[in-house]
Amino acid sequence: MARYRKKPVEIEAVQWTEDVSMRTLIDFTNGLVKLNDVDRDFHVYDRLHDTWVRFEYGDWIIKGVQGEFYPCRDDVFAATYEAVTD
């Protein structure tokens, strides 16, 4: 069986925590958000797949290379990504 390595690709991401303002989340997702304060549900509309994607508190919201959004748990994000310094 052949083995593959993920290409190094820079992504944009923001973590949904109490330190991040709703304005930051709205701006990052181009206003494609729904938030339910009671359940702490947060959804971002993914135009590429024409669906609402659910995020849990503490998840990273990743904007993919085609503008799609997907969630990533904090532990997985830490093991997979590192900050880009220019």
Sequence positions of predicted segments:
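N-terminal non-globular leader segments, chiefly Sec-dependent signal peptides
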Residues: 1-49
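Short, compact, well-ordered microdomains
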Residues: 50-86
